[in-house]
């Protein structure tokens, strides 16, 4: 017998896919997207996995919509490919028989002499055996990457999961699983545990999409996260064999990544190691503390929650209310709050001047310089403070309308305007006092804000004190549930109903403050809205009504081009409905907007 002869054993034939053409086309689309560096290749891969599991033949792409991960786009592509296939091969061309022929050819076993294909395959096998095996990338236990993978995986397992998480939400949820801080770097360094997310994206374990960023697991990341989760909770989903006979996960990094990981993690701040008991209710065997620092903090299908008695209601004061301008006047407010024994915290607020948060109570850890960072949920009350001179200035420069619009869009259900009338000071301003009073009334009647009038900073402090006491009593027996900014409720009635039922859904402070950033990266639609609101007479409701019909400047200009006459162009937007009363935008504003975007010379 020749020395190079290979004995071939029996091979169990794999079941053939009944839709080989669809499988072939999806594979081509996936490979093409991967070559171009497009993230859509993950979508095609999911569709391929679903198609392989489906045992029945499909007549067209429309029928494939019943499968998981098949949307309108993929079904339309398959139908187009199928029509092209029929045009090239005739309407009677076989669609479901190719796989059976391929299976017959693949099942034919060579006898005696080996074909060229077999020899080439043997050479490739020897080459692969001789090559050094590349180690699989697995993040170190309780590192930033490890915590992010586990958090995304456990979030996907929850009922009603969106399948993705925002950055602030992900940092908050992943912190108990990580020994390093996701937000505070070590002294003298700029790196945090969040630095490892770029490595996860580079290794194609995590996908970052949209703006604000959404993070989700790829198929490869899902497989790795499932393995890490089974190791963490001590429940194996599959046996992992090793030479020592132990069921372990290989936590060895690739050689090219070892230096990168060491450089990143060596510069991070050591934080408290909290147990992993949120998603499964199980304690980690490797937990160095033995008990949870946040035992009253639980997890629900919507996210984590704060139980009654596990949090404090704290007033948050914007940094601008304590610094700059008239320091004597601003310090007077702080001193009054201290005199009234109000628990408050001065911080940067991206919208509003005062709000309240429910801050989790945490126990200091012996040996740690800083106590663990408690979770915070924002209550549905936010206050914008206005002195008469400030109100006058904001009306002149246009900030007044913009501030009201941003307060409506911030996600909190009960905005309040706190107006300091300051005696007769309004009589000496550049805008008549009657105009200022009318602006205040419009804020209450038209915009639906609650308006509180006071005389000076001392009365403002008294009102803040009363509100703090009221909210402490209102929420003292409530279970507070964390919700995403995108899952805003229906308004004030829902909030009161939930409080009456001793539960309330609130936003995390980090997510709220990040979503209210004024100068963050904006979409074309948002920039268009801001442009419209600079026009005299265009409110937020009117701008939103225009955006419903024309979301960008380009779409509006295209609509103007389709008009047959100048008069028709000027009246294009006049019949657009806005607001609750569904009033028309009117010919005057319609003509002004047309002149702004279509007049080449100076406006008349």
UniProtKB/Swiss-Prot annotation:
Question: A GO term (biological process) for this protein?
Answer: DNA catabolic process
Kindly list the GO molecular function terms attached to this UniProt entry: 3'-flap endonuclease activity; crossover junction DNA endonuclease activity; DNA binding; metal ion binding
E.C. no: 3.1.22.-
InterPro entries, alphabetized: DNA_pol_lamdba_lyase_dom_sf (IPR027421), EME1/EME2_C (IPR042530), ERCC4_domain (IPR006166), Mus81 (IPR033309), Restrct_endonuc-II-like (IPR011335), WH-like_DNA-bd_sf (IPR036388), WH_MUS81 (IPR047417), XPF_nuclease_Mus81 (IPR047416)
User: Taxonomically, which superkingdom?
Assistant: Eukaryota
Record's CDD domains?
A: WH_MUS81, XPF_nuclease_Mus81
UniProt keyword annotation of Secreted present: no
Give the enzyme class. hydrolase
Q: Which residues form the ERCC4 domain?
A: 314-423
UniProt cross-references to SUPFAM superfamilies, sorted A to Z: DNA polymerase beta, N-terminal domain-like, Restriction endonuclease-like
Q: Where is the composition biased (Acidic residues)?
A: 253-262
Region feature (Helix-hairpin-helix (2HhH)): 524-598
Sites binding Mg(2+) 1 sit at: 318, 321, 353, 384
Q: What is its main location?
A: nucleus
Active-site residues, Swiss-Prot/TrEMBL: 318, 321, 353
UniProt keyword Nuclease present: yes
Q: Do you know which Pfam families this protein is assigned to?
A: EME1-MUS81_C, ERCC4, MUS81-like_WH
The residues the record assigns to binding Mg(2+) 2 are: 321, 353, 384-385
The biased composition feature labelled Basic and acidic residues covers 116-128, 227-240
Places the protein is found: Nucleus, Nucleolus
**Family per similarity comment:** Belongs to the XPF family.
- UniProt function note: Catalytic subunit of two functionally distinct, structure-specific, heterodimeric DNA endonucleases MUS81-EME1 and MUS81-EME2 that are involved in the maintenance of genome stability. Both endonucleases have essentially the same substrate specificity though MUS81-EME2 is more active than its MUS81-EME1 counterpart. Both cleave 3'-flaps and nicked Holliday junctions, and exhibit limited endonuclease activity with 5' flaps and nicked double-stranded DNAs. MUS81-EME2 which is active during the replication of DNA is more specifically involved in replication fork processing.
Q: How is this protein named in the record? A: Structure-specific endonuclease subunit MUS81
Identify the species of origin: Danio rerio (Zebrafish)
């Amino acid at each position: 017998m020749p020395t190079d002869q290979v004995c071939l054993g029996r091979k169990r034939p794999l079941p053939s896919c009944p839709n080989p053409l669809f499988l072939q086309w999806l594979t081509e689309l996936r490979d093409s997207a991967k070559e171009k560096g497009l993230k859509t290749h993950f979508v095609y891969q999911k569709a391929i996995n679903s198609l392989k599991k489906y045992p029945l033949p499909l007549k067209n792409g429309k029928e494939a919509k019943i499968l998981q991960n098949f949307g309108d786009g993929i079904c339309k592509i398959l139908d187009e490919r199928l029509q092209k296939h029929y045009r090239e091969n005739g309407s009677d061309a076989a669609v479901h028989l190719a796989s059976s022929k391929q299976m017959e050819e693949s099942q034919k076993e060579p006898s005696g002499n080996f074909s060229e294909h077999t020899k080439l395959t043997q050479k490739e096998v020897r080459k692969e055996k001789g090559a050094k095996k590349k180690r699989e990338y697995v993040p170190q236990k309780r590192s930033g990457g490890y915590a992010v993978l586990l958090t995304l995986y456990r979030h996907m397992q929850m009922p009603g999961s969106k399948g993705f998480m925002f950055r602030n939400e992900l940092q908050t949820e992943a912190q108990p699983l990580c020994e390093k801080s996701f937000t505070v770097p070590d002294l003298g360094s700029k790196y945090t545990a969040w630095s490892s997310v770029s490595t996860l994206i580079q290794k194609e374990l995590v996908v970052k999409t949209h703006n604000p960023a959404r993070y989700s697991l790829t198929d490869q990341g899902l497989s790795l996260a499932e393995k890490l989760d089974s190791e963490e909770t001590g429940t194996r989903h599959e046996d992992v064999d090793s030479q020592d006979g132990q069921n372990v996960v290989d936590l060895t990094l690739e050689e090219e990544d070892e230096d990168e990981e060491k450089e990143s993690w060596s510069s991070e701040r050591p934080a408290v190691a909290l147990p992993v008991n949120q998603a499964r209710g199980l304690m980690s065997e490797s937990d160095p503390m033995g008990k949870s620092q946040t035992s009253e903090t639980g997890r629900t299908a919507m996210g984590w929650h704060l139980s009654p008695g596990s949090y404090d209601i704290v007033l948050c004061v914007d940094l601008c209310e304590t610094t700059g301008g008239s320091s004597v006047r601003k310090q007077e407010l702080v001193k009054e709050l201290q005199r009234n024994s109000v628990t408050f915290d001065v911080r940067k607020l991206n919208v509003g001047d005062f709000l309240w948060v429910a801050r989790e109570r945490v126990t200091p850890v012996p040996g740690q310089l800083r106590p663990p960072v408690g979770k915070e949920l924002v209550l549905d009350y936010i206050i914008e403070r206005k002195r008469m001179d400030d109100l006058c200035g904001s009306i002149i420069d246009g900030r007044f309308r913009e501030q009201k619009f941003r307060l409506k869009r911030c996600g909190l259900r009960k905005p309040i305007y706190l107006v300091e009338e300051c005696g007769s000071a309004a009589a000496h301003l550049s805008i008549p006092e009657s105009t200022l009073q009318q602006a205040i009334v419009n804020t209450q009647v038209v915009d639906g804000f609650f308006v509180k009038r006071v005389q000076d900073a001392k009365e403002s402090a008294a009102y803040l004190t009363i509100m703090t006491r009221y909210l402490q009593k209102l929420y003292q027996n409530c279970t507070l549930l964390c919700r995403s900014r995108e899952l805003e409720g229906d308004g004030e009635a829902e909030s009161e109903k939930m409080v009456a039922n001793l539960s309330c859904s609130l936003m995390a402070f980090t997510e709220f403050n990040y979503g209210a950033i004024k100068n963050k990266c904006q979409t074309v639609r948002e920039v268009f809205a801001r442009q419209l609101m600079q026009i005299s007479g265009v409110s937020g409701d009117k701008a939103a009504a225009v955006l419903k019909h024309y979301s960008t400047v380009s779409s509006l200009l295209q609509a103007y081009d389709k008009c047959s006459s100048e008069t028709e162009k000027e009246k294009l937007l006049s019949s657009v409905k806005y607001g609750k009363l569904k009033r028309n935008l009117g010919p005057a504003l319609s003509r002004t907007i047309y002149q702004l975007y279509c007049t080449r010379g100076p406006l008349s």
